[in-house]
Amino acid sequence: MKNILFVVFISMIFLFVCCNTTTNKNIIETEISDFDKILDSFQVNGSILIYDNDKNTFYSNDFDWAKNGKLPASTFKIPNSIIAVELGIIENDTTILKWNGEQRKMDIWEKDLSFKDAFRISCVPCYQEIARKIGTIKMKEYLEKFEYKNMIFDSLTIDNFWLEGNSKISQKQQIDFLRKAEFNLQMQQNSD
């Protein structure tokens, strides 16, 4: 779990060029128009949102977009992984997730994968199986505990609600979740 959170937080580190800054409830929001260039280079509409914990500052090209809920998609691997580890479904990053031999959307998913590799290559069928093992009741219980809100699912959609349907989470809510997860991990490390 520590490896997963470390990868997530490392991927959020950037060098910033400040442009337009506003303050809201001691949180600073700084607009970075250069982020639009990054998105434009990939021909993608959206926003980039980065949080600097030391400066209590958010950086984005579009704060309205960043506060609007979207399907969590691949980012749901993070809470899904934490829940699986907490419940003992996954022991560690070397736990093997067996391929059932069925054809998958991507060839790279068509083999047994370590948990670490399944995370790295975003193996959707692996995470669908993990979600089924977690089950509806435990998934709801943990998401409520994490304050990971607006996930809409039942026993029929337990393995795809983060990919399709009406579940929504904003980039801002995602960062709030990661901040809480980091804090809780630090608290656990300090108590060990």
For each predicted feature, which ranges?
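Sec-dependent signal peptide recognition
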Residues: K2-I10
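Beta-lactamase-like hydrolase cores
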Residues: T21-A66
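Glycine-rich, acidic and aromatic/proline-enriched surface loops and short helix-turn segments
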Residues: D40-K55, I90, T136, E144-K149, ...
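Flexible glycine/proline-enriched surface loops and loop-helix/loop-strand junctions
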Residues: N61-K67, K111-D112, R120-Y127, S155-W162
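Active-site SXXK
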Residues: G69-D93, A118
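Short, well-structured active-site flanking segments
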Residues: E86-G101, M187-D192
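Mid-domain, small-residue-enriched loop/turn segments at the edges of structured enzyme/sensor domains
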Residues: D107, S114-F115, E129-F183
